[in-house]
Amino acid sequence: MGCERKALILMVVIWIMSFWTLSLADISSTEIAVYWGQREDGLLRDTCKTNNYKIVFISFLDKFGCEIRKPELELEGVCGPSVGNPCSFLESQIKECQRMGVKVFLALGGPKGTYSACSADYAKDLAEYLHTYFLSERREGPLGKVALDGIHFDIQKPVDELNWDNLLEELYQIKDVYQSTFLLSAAPGCLSPDEYLDNAIQTRHFDYIFVRFYNDRSCQYSTGNIQRIRNAWLSWTKSVYPRDKNLFLELPASQATAPGGGYIPPSALIGQVLPYLPDLQTRYAGIALWNRQADKETGYSTNIIRYLNATAMPFTSNLLKYPS
């Protein structure tokens, strides 16, 4: 009887260690994205030089629609109409980031601004504008003469017209016609389906989905409780078309940047959250941080990288008990 009990204990320990090894392998390739575009964020080139990020979202193109003559790029305190300083000086920094292997996306929408995809015809015009002035280097646009790596749909404002699927479809067709390599991504809220982007997501044209797991108590992390975020993640793995490693968790880099909650300390993210997310091995690609300023203040991305580079054994005891 004693030998059987010891054998059972050994089997359990082996299972736990194999689970831990697999989980660590799954998250060790974590890619980090960050939103950049405020005065306190520092220089774009310096953001890329940290080597912490694989993707930078220039945020935001947040003024466009049928009643707006020309789309406007507003980088708070950096450049744009409110500052009275054009953003074309960023051209050299964008290209420097790209030479370093950092993908630079243009983020549409955001929490402020005035924007809408007000009709199917306007969606087509906007797609052509984005391709001409941001994605092709064909003409000098608000960021200079650039070919950005992608367009990011960060739609957070209630509008009557929801033609985001039309805009996505037009961009996808442009990509096909010109044999372009630019990427398309979205940042829906953690509650699935997303009220603004669900139709667009169902087109299956997004390369990456960055799910916002904050400012929504129904599906975000709270201290010591991962059940809501786990359930939301599972819902997204089922509702989003299967594509290898195309789901990111978008998280606040500090408590202050998410007044509605959802902040996850780096140690808890690596030790208590990620290892318990379903389909991690096939669907998880990394995390996105809101925003660069907060990351500078807290060192969130640096801590994530430090934990990933370590053996992570300090967190083993946390894995022996499923968090509530």
Swiss-Prot record:
Positions bearing carbohydrate: N309
Record's protein name: Concanavalin B
GO molecular function: chitinase activity
Signal sequence range: 1-25
Source organism of this protein record: Canavalia ensiformis (Jack bean)
Pfam families: Glyco_hydro_18
Highest taxon of source: Eukaryota
Function as written in the Swiss-Prot or TrEMBL entry: May act as a carbohydrate-binding protein.
Protein family membership: Belongs to the glycosyl hydrolase 18 family.
PANTHER family the UniProt entry points to: ENDOCHITINASE, III ACIDIC ENDOCHITINASE, PUTATIVE-RELATED
One Gene Ontology CC term in the entry: extracellular region
Alphabetized SUPFAM superfamilies for the sequence: (Trans)glycosidases
GO biological process, one term: carbohydrate metabolic process
Boundaries of every GH18 domain copy: 30-311
Keywords assigned by UniProt, alphabetized: Glycoprotein, Signal
